Regions:
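Extracytoplasmic metal-acquisition and chelation regions
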Residues: 2-15, 20-21, 26, 33-362
Length: 362
């Protein structure tokens, strides 16, 4: 990874942890059993050293990224933030059991991604509203403009077209992520108005010192690249990266289908892109099947695949290391973009040992 990004990594890791630590210890994220649908296993953060219990506000989040934003904003306040999605699962396609709805009912606030992204969250919200439950609803997407599903692609290209709907993965653009941090801060202020100054300060610090730095480092990566096309063996989740940094992010399918719904024609189109641009490395989604990526390695000039993620979930080891949006950006997505764009050799990208760990990962 280039020196700018390496320096940014060190600064950001320190700053984020400083925000979370505050004047006293913040409880570390607690890992649960991968595949469990009991809720809360993606992590729990209790700010200002409070014990978990009913004497302080409890906030639950439907998606990892917004759990992470909420726990950072809530640092040094009595607010407890919980992630509902179990460790190891994708926050989009997961279907919880009835206990999750009860956790939302019991919580003081529910942070969600907006309508039509997580059907289970939409159903839970409908239940809350129908039953008159007073759980505060915090829409992380409020006021954020969405881009088209093929926004970074050529609509004249065969199979692309227009009017395919909107891409819901807005948080991959750090500037749009800043608006979601503000939305979450507004909701937490309404929940705990006595702590407004701390909540606003935490949000402002995170936006300025973390999200703006991530944005700048992404921009350095993409502006340094000689090629402006990235082939992903993954579903269509990265159009905001393409729009923000003027690069074609080519998924295997343009709609929101998961990568295990790939047709032979999708693989054929990917092969043509790989041949046309001389692509040697592709990105593969951490929480999706690796079969399409493995097929491209077998049948094309692609040498290997490396990880990308739309921050849709966390692995067990990420929870143990207390990784959030920032750490995933610097340790997963940025090194892979450096490699797939041809900026860096795999062995030179990321932290020490990154290529050995993630090359053709299982």
């Amino acid at each position: 990874m280039n020196e700018t990004v390496q320096a940014g990594t060190r600064r950001n890791l320190s700053r984020r942890r400083a925000i979370l630590a505050g004047a006293s210890a913040v409880a570390t994220a607690v890992a649960g059993c991968a595949g469990s649908a009991t809720g809360g296993s993606g992590g729990t953060a209790t700010a200002a050293g409070e014990e978990s219990g009913s004497d302080h506000p409890v906030v639950v989040a439907s998606f990892f990224s917004f759990y992470d934003f909420a726990r950072i904003v809530a640092a040094d306040t009595p607010i407890e933030v919980r992630n509902l999605v179990p460790t190891g699962l994708h926050g989009h396609g997961w279907e919880p059991n009835a206990r999750i709805t009860q956790e939302i009912v019991d919580a003081d606030a529910f942070v969600h991604v907006g309508a039509d992204f997580q059907p289970w969250a939409d159903r839970a919200i409908a239940t809350l509203e129908a039953d008159g439950v007073d759980t505060e609803l915090i829409n992380a997407r409020e006021g954020i403009e969405l881009v088209d599903l093929a926004a970074s692609l050529d609509p004249e290209e065969e199979g692309i077209g227009e009017n395919r709907g909107k891409d819901p993965h807005f948080w991959l653009d750090p500037q749009r992520a800043k608006q979601s941090v503000d939305n979450i801060a507004d909701g937490l202020v309404a929940l705990a108005p006595d702590h407004e100054e701390t909540l606003r300060d935490n949000a402002a610090s995170y936006k300025r010192e973390v999200l703006d730095r991530i944005d700048a480092d992404y921009r350095d990566i993409f502006e340094s690249a000689e090629r402006d096309v990235v082939q992903l063996a993954a579903h269509n989740a990265f159009q905001y990266v393409g729009v923000a940094y003027d690069v074609e992010m080519r998924p295997l399918v343009t709609n929101l289908a998961a990568s295990d719904d790939i047709k032979p024609s999708d693989i054929t189109e990917a092969k043509e892109t790989i041949d046309e641009y001389g692509i040697e490395y592709v990105g593969a989604a951490v929480f999706e099947t690796r079969r399409p990526a493995q097929q491209l390695v077998r049948e094309t000039a692609v040498k290997a695949y490396f990880p990308v993620t739309p921050y849709a979930g966390v692995r067990e080891e990420w929870v143990e290391e207390d990784w959030g949006y920032e750490e995933i950006a610097y340790n997963i997505n940025m090194p892979t973009f450096e490699v797939v764009l041809g900026n860096e050799r795999p062995e030179d990208a990321g932290p020490e040992g990154w290529a050995a760990e993630w090359r053709n990962f299982e």
